[in-house]
Amino acid sequence: MFGLEAIELARIQFAFTISFHILFPAITIGLASYLAVLEGLWLKTRDDVYRDLYHFWSKIFAVNFGMGVVSGLVMAYQFGTNWSRFSDFAGAVTGPLLTYEVLTAFFLEAGFLGVMLFGWNRVGRNLHFFSTVMVAIGTLISTFWILSSNSWMQTPQGFEIIDGRVIPTDWFAVVFNPSFPYRLTHMAIAAFVATAFFVGSSAAWHLLRGRDTPAVRKMLSMAMWMALLVAPVQAVVGDFHGLNTLKHQPAKIAAIEGHWENIGDEPTPLILFGIPDMKEERTKYKVEIPYLGSLILTHSLDKQVPALKEFKPEDRPNSLIVFWSFRVMVALGMLMIFTGLWSLWLRKRGTLYSSRPFLYLALWMGPSGLVAILAGWFTTEIGRQPWVVYGLMRTADASSGHSVAQMSITLVLFVVVYFVLFGAGLGYMMRLVRKGPKAYVEHVPHGGPGQQRTPARPLSAAVESEDDGDNPDRLGKGN
């Protein structure tokens, strides 16, 4: 297919499915915590705006959560179908870590999700709030285990290799491997920031259409406070993550910087733009700032950054891809910080909700957090190449050995099915977003004499009336 080998098609297939999948957990993590904050504020203040926002976003959360679970199952199967040699080699580490995620996180979420989505007016307020908090904690615990497994593949430790297989010898070292704290923090904050801009974009859309309600204003206000406070923190965390990567994966940093060779003892420049050429072993048309590379990456003007030519050609990541994916991530991060600062300036002037240029920026920034997450994952995963487990197993040795025809057919099927099914799901979720928050009316529906109506499935928490308009009596209730 297009002159690609089976291993390349397997990588493209996994990249496609995981790129689709990560969008949903990122929003799930952020929305779960956002819902917990909204319900907590409602219980404390009794301000109905928080309650109305809770019921509005809980419906969107239900749809997003369902799509995240389904897309995650596909990825799990691929470890066995497409990457069986990797599973055989490292399964003693990755298998238990993913099992811990199911036992501690997924079961916690599943146990309280029903109460959270369908328990309003059926359980006490404190119990319902507790359920929402447990779901939020469950999403973070899930992030913990998934990032631990992935980080171990980046910086493996706490193991022995016996008979060609990884055998864990120190589970604490496995879980808390050198890159794990930085990657966990970076990803969790990224999920919060991505959700903030998703929420802020939704509010901006309604304000631009003249729907200036207290609930919409509160959405925008909370989103911009999050952007203002957390986006700069993400930049600092990213800096520490970069220092950790320089220590443990210097070839990745060299590829990200497009830095091919050091000249004498001269400090490393920072290449702002250019086109890395893997064949010619140089970065063409580069625009650089002298010394700044050393200052940013080593916090010193006396040290140099390792160069790509210091590594064997077969051990070098594809510099062209990670060079630009990293810059997309950083550029979006800077734009997020700018948006947060602009919102503060407008807030002080009293024009946060009426400045159309700002509202248009907030609207278009809606997907920025998700795009930045994808760019960041492309950087870290492609930058790990040619290794699937850094320094231990090459990606070329990890695949199941399927034919080009098999991988081509399944890749095409995945693309078609994903765009149809998840396209429909995303369209439905955007339909809910466009409706906006409405006033919630306390009402307990009944399905028969002495029986309350009970939703039959999680996605039925996202309720719409027949005329494509919300019935306030049904907000937050099931079919």
Describe the role of every protein-language-model region.
Residues 1-479:
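Polytopic transmembrane helical bundles with strong interfacial aromatic enrichment
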